[in-house]
């Protein structure tokens, strides 16, 4: 039997390499609104889907949209109390250890508590 091997052409390899560098889908980065932007945001324009004769609670939808935006903004803020960068309203609790501990010198053995 002969040891015939099938090889790919160089132009095909280059084409495959070029294709792999292109993103498959579009990537969109979106900045979250700042607290000032959320407060300054005006209510959305009324929907064009409103039909005459239909009762509508105008304030409920606006409140839900703005409330959701504020809720999502708050979720992005970590307030665990144990991390740097938390706001002044976050208080972390650290329990003090009031028992004296003797740290042994090199070669002394186990520390006494």
From Swiss-Prot:
Residues 1-12 have a biased composition (Basic residues). Residues 1-61, 78-113 are annotated as: Disordered. Pfam families: GAGE (PF05831). InterPro entries: GAGE (IPR031320), GAGE_fam (IPR008625). Belongs to the GAGE family. This is P antigen family member 3. It comes from Homo sapiens (Human). The lineage of its organism: Eukaryota, Metazoa, Chordata, Craniata, Vertebrata.
């Amino acid at each position: 039997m002969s040891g015939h091997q099938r090889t790919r052409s160089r132009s095909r390899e280059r084409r495959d390499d070029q294709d792999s560098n292109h993103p498959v889908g579009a990537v969109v980065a979106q900045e979250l609104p700042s607290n000032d932007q959320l407060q300054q945001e005006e209510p959305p324009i009324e929907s064009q889907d409103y039909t005459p004769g239909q009762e509508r609670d105008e304030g409920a939808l606006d409140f839900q949209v703005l409330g959701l935006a504020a809720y999502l903004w708050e979720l992005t803020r970590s307030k665990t109390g144990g991390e740097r960068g938390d706001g002044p309203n976050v208080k972390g609790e650290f329990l003090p250890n009031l028992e004296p501990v003797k740290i042994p010198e090199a070669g002394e053995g186990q520390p006494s508590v």
